[in-house]
Amino acid sequence: MKINLKQIGIHFLVILGFALVAILYFNPVLNGKKIYQSDIVQYTGMAKQQLDFRKANDAESYWTNGAFGGMPTYQLGAKYPHNYIKKLDLAIRFLPRPADYLFLYLLGFYVLLLVLKIDYKVAILGALAFGFSTYLIIILGVGHNAKAHAIAYMPLVLSGIILTFQKRYCL
């Protein structure tokens, strides 16, 4: 397998460009401002008991009475000690929220289009069109972060499926 440093350099610059686009679009986050996300405000109330327990006991509670009359906390941000995928996810989402989700949208769709053997210039345009599609921006505004997170990873999942069926185990 021959490594093409020019192509790697181009893709690296594109990824840097996507990070820059995400930061520029959400530039108020650089000043510490945050979007008022109604669902996140509601989450804060539901997760208060869990967060108080974590702070007081330095341990996790996997049950809360603060949501729906009692429920497991896995949907409210319970932390698990050996969740290495979460650590990888946090490394990929190095930008402040919500710019991190926009970056994931752009990166994931760019990779999908490259896997589909689309020219990188067209892939850039496709990624920008996908990332800035109306719905994907709207869900960030109301706090549907878990949905945005799942949608952002779907192009990468599809890329992996396509590569597996093509028996191409490396990009």
Where are these regions (language model features)?
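Membrane-water interface at transmembrane helix exits
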Residues: 26, 113-114, 162, 166
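Juxtamembrane/transmembrane-helix boundary motifs in multi-pass membrane proteins
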Residues: 2-10, 89-97, 118, 142, ...
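Membrane-interface transmembrane helices that cradle and orient dolichyl/undecaprenyl
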Residues: 157-171
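Residue-level signature of transmembrane alpha-helical entry/exit and packing/kink sites
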Residues: 7-15, 98, 102, 123
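Membrane-interface coil-to-helix junctions
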Residues: 22-112, 128-155
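Start-transfer (signal-anchor) and selected internal transmembrane alpha helices
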Residues: 1-25
